[in-house]
Structures are given as structure tokens and as C-alpha cells.
Curated annotation (Swiss-Prot):
PANTHER family: D-SERINE DEHYDRATASE (PTHR48078:SF9), THREONINE DEHYDRATASE, MITOCHONDRIAL-RELATED (PTHR48078)
Organism field: Bacillus cereus (strain ZK / E33L)
Name of the protein this chain belongs to: Probable D-serine dehydratase
Keywords: Lyase, Pyridoxal phosphate
Name of the coding gene: dsdA
InterPro entries, per database record: D_Ser_am_lyase, Ser/Thr_Dehydratase, Ser/Thr_deHydtase_PyrdxlP-BS, TrpB-like_PALP, TrpB-like_PALP_sf
Amino acid sequence: MKEIETLKEEYPLLNKLIATEEVFWVNPNMEKYETAIKDSPLSEENVKDAEERLKRFASYIAKVFPETKETKGIIESPLLKIPSMKQALEKNYEQPILGELLLKCDSHLPISGSIKARGGIYEVLKHAEQLALQHGMLTEEDDYSILDSDTCREFFATYSIAVGSTGNLGLSIGIMSAKLGFNVTVHMSADAKQWKKDLLRSKGVNVIEYEADYSKAVEEGRRQADADPSCYFVDDENSHDLFLGYAVAASRLQKQLEELKIVVDEEHPLFVYLPCGVGGGPGGVAFGLKLLYKDNVHCFFAEPTHSPCMLIGLMTGLHDKIAVQDIGIDNVTDADGLAVGRPSGFVGKTMEPFLSGNYTVSDEELYRLLKELADTENIYLEPSALAGMIGPVKVCKEDAYLQKQQLMEKVQKGTHIVWGTGGSMVPEDVMNGYYKTGEALTILEK
């Protein structure tokens, strides 16, 4: 790897990142959609295949998770207009937000209460389907609810699944795997919240805790799985299946926008702000949206100032060959879902030509935004889920991107969607603590 001093000369923004200041970065490597898609390792067919598989499993999901009965086994979340929060943001940051502001509430996804319910559950279902088909327990024409039987659970119990996680991915993989009957182990990093570990253990999941960070938990999970031929490892750093599970969100969002009579075209751009840890969730969602809306959707990743792994990987072009710790950033943040020091190389390289930009936000800001959203809209998210909330302010304030893309005239006819990635499963006492922190920081700021 190049010496840090050389990197700092080449990429002056690194100095601000090293000082853990908030930054806004416009991706110079973004290409027009038609150019970018030609070299993409994944295509629309891959996403459609994932969508069809989730439809096949819908009858099973509706049967074993009654909370999905209403949506007939489709795991989906609301898309809400948040006008009071928009007003508060404009007032607090003295910056008009041009266009409408909406919140995608993946915080309220059924089963595991976070965006990870998309990719994590999808990958487990795909693995279960492959095993069941191979062993003649299922055909693609069957009603998949037949998997809810003692025979199937006993069959899956002869196999195991492992994953490394800071929390939310572990919840979705753990809950889904245990429900099917698999033996499941979640390797959790030091920053994983206690309540997430407790919840998993209550579902019969084996939780192994590490003193080290996320990358170490993943490495250990991979090692355990490598030693056991019957163990399947969900690889958050490299998984195409996770990525595709997230990508399915796009066509669902398209339907919701249509229901709200919100147009997305050249004159009505769509801006989407996605909290980013290792990259799979935001990468998959952004990829899916690009397939649908092409150059009319503009996706931004949001990271904590102490864990800007994807930004550093993309900016330097080093991707997973560089970690935040290499340049003296500690990777310590209360945004546990985003506490990742080394980004996914697969996601970084796949998304590089599609991504509009990336910005960082401090933990203090996340808490203040958490309190503000609770006060204005009565919606409670976990700290990491608020990373997207400041995006519309940043894009409108630092208008370099809007100028570059000739969007200055169009933005007020556009729509901003903040992806709320988690929060509904946070225990009340923990959430009260978050709120109080936000309250104290708001008073301090004033």
C-alpha cells in the first residue's frame, strides 16, 4: 500500500477524514448508467431471480411469521412523508431542502426490524431451498409452506450456518436460520449491543463474542465454517446473494412511489441516502434502484466519522486493501451497524461507477437527529439509522454535485428518500437512553 503521506497528498480530503471531521465527497468515477452496467458483474436477471425466489417462499414466511400475514409473506416496510422533520432540518441547519422528503422505514421491517431482514433472510432462504431441492424435499412448483414441518426442521438441523456481525445481520440470519431448524452461530464483534446478543440467544442461536472489531468476527466465522463441510458461511464482505436480497427493495419502492403519485424521471430526480457499514445493504439497494431509474436516481452512502471505510476505499481506489485503522482512525462509534473498518471490495468495485457520492456524520449529530425525528414525527430509529437523515441538507448545501449533474433547476421537483435502516426492535430502556443522549447534546449545542 502507498505510504500514508503520499495518499494524503493525492487525496487532500483524507486530512479531514483523519481528523474525524464531517466531509462530503462527490464520486469522480461515476459513469452514465449505460456505460456502468456493461461492466457490472451483476444484472437485472440476477435481481429478478432473487425476487422470484422470495415470492416462492412467501407462503412459508406468512405461515411461520404471523406478522407478515397481512402482506402475504412479503417482507416490506412503509415509505412515509416526513414534512415536520423536513421543517426541523431546514430550521436547525439553516438550509432549505429542495424537493420532498420521505423516510423508508426498514427500521420497521417484520421479523428482524432492520434492512438486514432483506439480504440476510434472502440468503438463508436460498441456501435452504438449494438443500431441500437437492435432497428431494421440495420442488420449485411446491407450496413452500411445507417446509414448516418437523421432518424439514430435523433435516436442516443436520446443517449449520455461521455469520460474523456487528448486530443486525446477525439478528436476521439467526432468527431465520433457527426458524428453519438450522444450527446457527453468530460471531459478534465488541461493538455489538448487548440486547441484540440476548435476543439471539433467546431464539436458540449460538452467539460467540469477540473483544476485537467486525473484521475479526467475520474472519473467525469464516474459519469455523471452513473446518466444517456441513456449515454454510454467510460472507457479509463478499456475498452476491446478500447483495441481491437487498436489491429486490428497489422494485418494491417503485410501487410505493407510484402509489404516492411521485414521479421519477429526468425532470423529477430521486435522491437516496443510505447508511453504510461494510457496504452490502446500501450497495444492493442502490444497485437495484439504478437498474430501475438509471441516471435519474442519485445514491449517496452515509458513514460515521470514526468508520468511513467505504469512502476511503472508493476515494483511494484501494477498496478492501485499506482499513480506517491504517490511517489512524479508531473505528469506534455508537452507530454499531456501521462500525466497520474495512469495506467490502466486491461492493466497492461493483458500485464505484454507479454511486453519486459519500459523506460522513458524527455520533453527536446522529443522536441529535434521533431526538429530532422522535419529536417531530414520533418515529424512533437506532443511531446508525439516522446517518442518511442529514444527506438532503448536505447535498443542497454543498451544491457541487447538483452543479456537476446540472440538477440545480430540477432538484425542487425531486424527491429525497432517507433509508431508515433499523430501530423497531431496540428495547424501550435502550431507546430512552439514546433519546436522552440526543436531548443532552441538543442543549449543549444551543
